Amino acid sequence: MLGRDGVMPLDHFRRLIDVHLIGTFNMIRLFADKARHLDPLSEDGDRGVIVNTSSIFGLEGQIDAVSYSAAKAGIAGMTLPLARELAREGIRVVAIAPGIFETPMVTSLRETAREQILDAVAFPKRMGKPREYAQLVRHICENNMLNGAVIRIDAGIRT
C-alpha cells in the first residue's frame, strides 16, 4: 500500500476488487439465474455447482498484495452465504483456495523468489500442477455433499 513511489492509487485497489470480486459475483448471479430454470440433474435436485477461485492470500493475507488479498477474501467470504441462498434452487457453491501453482505468473518470477516461496511449503516441496487443481474441481463437481466450503489446496504452505 505504501511503496517507493508513494501511496497505492485508489484506482489500483478498485480495479483489482472489480476484476476479482465483483467479476466473480457477476458471473455467479448470471449463472444462477439461468441454472435455476434447468431440470434437476439428479434425485438430489441439483442444478449445478459454482466453483470459485479464492486464494491462500485471501485467507491469510500477503504483504504487498492488500488489494488482491482483499478481493480473494471476499470470494471466500461470500461462499457460504451464497451456498445457503442458492440451496433452494439446487445450486451448490464451493471455493478453492490454491497455494502456489505452476502458472505463467509464478513461473515468470526470478528463481530466487520462487525458492523463497517454496521454503514455506510443507509437503510436497514443489508448486502445484494445474492438473491437481483440475482434479479437485472434478471431485467437487461429482460430490454433492461439498457445498459452502472453502477448500485449501496448498501442500501445507503457511505464509
Predicted segment positions?
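Short, small/polar-rich loop/turn modules that mediate ligand/substrate recognition or access, typified
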Residues: A87, R92, M145-A149
